[in-house]
Amino acid sequence: MSRVRVGILGCGMIAQLMHLPYLTELEDRFEIAALCDQDKALAQRVAARHRVPRVHDSWENLLDTVPSLDAVLILNKDHFAPALMALERGIHTFTEKPLCYTQGEAEQLVGTAERTGAKLMVGYMKRYDSGVRRGLEEMRRISAPRMARAHIVVGPDYGNWIIPEIQRIDRPAGAEADSGTDGRTAKARGELGTGSPALLAAYMDMFGVWSHDINVLRAAFPAAPTSVTARVSPDGGTLTALLGHADGLQCVFLGGKTSVRLFEENLTVWGSDRVVELHISNPFLRHVPSTVRVRQDEAPSSGRPRPLTVERTVDGSHHEAFKAQLCHFHACVTTPELQPLTSGQESLEDIRLMLAILRSAR
């Protein structure tokens, strides 16, 4: 099997918890050539644990000096500038979600990937969860979808509290930059045309954890809605949206937070012939499958006054979605005709919908 030589940009929580351990496990597919983080001491400690030979404190330096890179994984907070530089050089590029924070940036990245031929893939790992994939298959079998509801409600720290490893993450020295100091809030303000604290807070959550659910919802119903209305709470921590489609389908999106320690992430579709519920597992619980429930009436039979309702439950496999995602990226890099399931173009369409929701919010 061909090994892909990768550089890692960003050594934070998701890199340490998921990407680096699975890249190391997949050593028959990947060679980690170098790491970079703006906190070089952090990068050196992480590199020592994973036996990575080269460490840099800037992505520019990594891209300029590491020879023969096939691909990069961009795992920092704002992916646009390093992704653009990598794609311009024809380097296959994986970014964590979101791809970027503005529609214009997304269009530029997609256009650059098309021009240079480099693959651009976005880390919506839930699309590589076998339970999610089965749930989407079941939804496509619905003859006439009538209503859908996607909701994500999470407890403290976005549900990350659930695993003890979170306490052992190696942190950078000093205070970490937040969205207000690293430029992301300024980009959000420019897209919205407002400095409303509630909308800016909702923007960060929409482009953060909620973007997974927009992506799954769009996987089920790719067509752009013909009407969008939304409401946001005064603190920006809760947002509801109603999406109307040309065929009569109505979708409700709900994103929110709670102080209760829970993680709820579901997509339910009610159709003319069946109801499909997809219950997505907490991504920080490794090898825990997502679950699909399908309810439908049996065909009528003689001697029965009315059909019976049957419910089927299907659990996904215990194969880890983060690992499956990396295997897919490897396949895309090494197979010229294979395009990413969660491509840059798909992410651009997600961003268009997310912005439509946020701009309609009151």
Model-derived features: positions:
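N-terminal Rossmann-like dinucleotide-binding module
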Residues: M1-H50
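Beta-loop-alpha module in the N-terminal Rossmann-like domain of NAD(P)-dependent dehydrogenases
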Residues: H50-T112
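C-terminal helix-rich "cap/oligomerization" subdomain common to oxidoreductases
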Residues: N61, A71, A118, C327-R362
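Hydrophobic residues in well-ordered beta-strands that form the structural core
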Residues: T95-E96, L120-V122, L278
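A contiguous active-site-proximal alpha/beta segment in oxidoreductase catalytic domains
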Residues: Y101-S179
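Mid-domain beta-loop-alpha active-site segment that forms a flexible
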Residues: G123-S130, N160-A224
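C-terminal glycine/acidic-rich active-site capping loop/insertion
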Residues: R168-P197, T268-L341
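Contiguous beta-strand/loop segments that form the cofactor/metal-binding neighborhood of enzyme cores
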Residues: A198-F284, G316-E337, M354-I357
